[in-house]
Amino acid sequence: DPLYTKFVSLVKSDPVIHTLLPLSPKGEICDINGVCVDAAEDEFFRLTTKEGKLTVERDVVRTKTTDYSPILQFEQDPVQILDALLPLYLNSQILRALQESLASELAARMSAMSNAAA
């Protein structure tokens, strides 16, 4: 879970924790051939505060799974699709966090310089 400063406006930035993986808490999803895309019993880790101190909470997601409809067909195996998209997703989310952090830093610098000049 990356922690970054989300750019809201020129005068406001918010600290944000964004979960990258697992993609969703829906558990295991299997196609008609029995090939599973996500794993049941996924673990989520949340960074929280308890009594003024940072702590990590661990949670296991338990959900019921449903199979795809036999009418639904994939041109490629869902696992191959996910394997191809996962690096692109991670790269885009990390790049977005870096860009928002940079925008927040530049806005804070502009604000500090305008306050110093006044």
From Swiss-Prot:
InterPro entries: ATP_synth_F1_ATPase_gsu, ATP_synth_F1_gsu. One of its GO terms (molecular function) is proton-transporting ATP synthase activity, rotational mechanism. Disulfide bonds join C30-C36. One of its GO terms (cellular component) is chloroplast thylakoid membrane. It is a peripheral membrane protein. Keywords: ATP synthesis, CF(1), Chloroplast, Disulfide bond, Hydrogen ion transport, Ion transport, Membrane, Plastid, Thylakoid, Transport. It comes from the Eukaryota. It holds the Pfam family ATP-synt. It is found in: Plastid, Chloroplast thylakoid membrane. Produces ATP from ADP in the presence of a proton gradient across the membrane. The gamma chain is believed to be important in regulating ATPase activity and the flow of protons through the CF(0) complex. F-type ATPases have 2 components, CF(1) - the catalytic core - and CF(0) - the membrane proton channel. CF(1) has five subunits: alpha(3), beta(3), gamma(1), delta(1), epsilon(1). CF(0) has four main subunits: a, b, b' and c. Belongs to the ATPase gamma chain family. This is ATP synthase subunit gamma, chloroplastic. The lineage of its organism: Eukaryota, Viridiplantae, Streptophyta, Embryophyta, Tracheophyta.
